[in-house]
């Protein structure tokens, strides 16, 4: 096998390992303008949501034969996959709608770069919509579980599915879209997106961002002691506000930041992994 063939196979393998698709896309390129490609980003971001931490979703029967029979008869696993697929589809549509106006603006040269649209409210709306859809889907699954007597301990813990989960899937979707071939057409969108919060980012937030901002303010910012998946919206909003201020204060200095949280997440996350 010659070197060129090796390089092609290596690139195909890299693409497969990243997106879970093999030889499905011409030239191994993904486009934000293609809905099916955006769905790939949503699927990958969903795995980052860490659904394994949602109590009851894996449905461990632990010897409960009655529950096992009911779930088999009602095709619980198939229903779960279908409901989650519906949530992903709705999120995909919402993300496409968020990006679409900028595709038109770029194409028609109508001055998208000068727009002052604030995407934060749109991202909150998308995240809350996904959270509501997802929790509703989990309640439907609980209805099957609760048909069996004494099965309440097996139910999905819907009450503890917090905003932190929703922000992760939405913000990570946007992050993955930055890897797409036409990402440069949507620069203004990415500049206004928010930083995905996970354990590494919150570690940096507590160690670096809180300390830095407290040194420049009269008031004291508190460290975040909540796990990212358990964040409520108000705490999340305060963290994002502080992250944005920190990124803007430190752009073009030795921290190598741009002033845009989502873009700077690549640098910060890499530094946290490598420290």
For each of these PLM feature ranges, what is it?
Residues 2-160:
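Phosphate/adenylate-binding glycine loop and adjacent helical scaffold
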Residues 1-35, 39, 139-152, 158-171, ...:
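C-terminal accessory module of base-excision DNA glycosylases/AP lyases that mediates lesion recognition
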């Amino acid at each position: 096998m010659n070197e060129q063939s090796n390089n092609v196979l290596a690139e195909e393998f890299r693409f497969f390992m990243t997106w879970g698709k093999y030889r499905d896309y011409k030239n191994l390129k993904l486009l934000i303008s293609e809905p099916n490609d955006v769905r790939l980003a949503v699927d990958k971001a969903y795995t980052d949501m860490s659904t394994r931490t949602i109590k009851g979703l894996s449905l461990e029967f632990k010897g409960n034969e009655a529950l096992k029979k009911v779930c088999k008869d009602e095709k619980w696993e198939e229903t779960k996959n279908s409901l989650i697929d519906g949530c992903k589809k709705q999120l995909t549509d919402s993300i496409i709608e968020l990006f679409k106006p900028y595709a038109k603006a770029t194409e028609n040269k109508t001055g998208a770069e000068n727009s002052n649209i604030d995407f934060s409210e749109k991202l909150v709306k998308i995240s809350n919509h996904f959270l509501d859809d997802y929790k509703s889907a989990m309640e439907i699954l609980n209805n099957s579980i609760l048909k069996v007597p004494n099965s309440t301990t097996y139910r999905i813990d819907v009450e503890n599915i917090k905003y932190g989960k929703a922000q992760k899937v939405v913000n990570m979707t946007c992050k993955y879209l930055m890897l797409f071939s036409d990402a440069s057409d949507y620069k203004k969108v990415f500049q206004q997106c928010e930083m995905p919060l996970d354990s590494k980012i919150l570690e940096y937030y507590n160690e670096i961002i809180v300390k830095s901002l407290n040194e420049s303010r009269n008031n004291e910012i508190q460290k975040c002691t909540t796990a990212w998946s358990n964040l409520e919206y108000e705490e999340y909003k305060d963290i994002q506000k502080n992250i944005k201020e920190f990124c803007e204060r430190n752009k073009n200095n030795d921290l190598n930041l741009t002033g845009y949280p989502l873009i700077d997440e690549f640098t910060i996350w890499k530094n946290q992994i490598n420290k």
